[in-house]
């Protein structure tokens, strides 16, 4: 995938530490930072599927995971899921 691809980051609601279920982006910060560092344009899209994160490139889902498995905040450098997602976007056609 060329640099500066458009990546749609679809994310669902989740419950954090007993709080109500809602869409939150705190756990997406590292993933966004890693993709932005590679020069990709990121579009956030809320979905209704609980706990789900999907990366869509050229209308194809190239990566998905449970949002609660992503590290909270940070730059994503030490999160293995962020690296896995970055590679999936780079390998997308």
From Swiss-Prot:
Domain of life, per lineage: Eukaryota
Signal peptide region: none
A Pfam cross-reference name: UPF0728
Family: Belongs to the UPF0728 family.
Protein name per UniProt: UPF0728 protein C10orf53 homolog
């Amino acid at each position: 995938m060329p640099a500066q691809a458009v990546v749609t980051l679809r994310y669902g609601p989740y419950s954090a530490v007993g709080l109500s279920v809602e869409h939150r982006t705190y756990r997406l910060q590292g993933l966004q930072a890693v993709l932005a560092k590679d020069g990709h344009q990121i579009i956030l899209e809320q979905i209704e599927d609980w706990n789900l994160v999907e990366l869509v490139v050229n209308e194809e889902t190239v990566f998905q995971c449970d949002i609660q498995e992503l590290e909270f905040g940070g730059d994503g450098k030490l999160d293995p899921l962020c690296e896995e997602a970055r590679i999936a976007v780079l390998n997308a056609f």
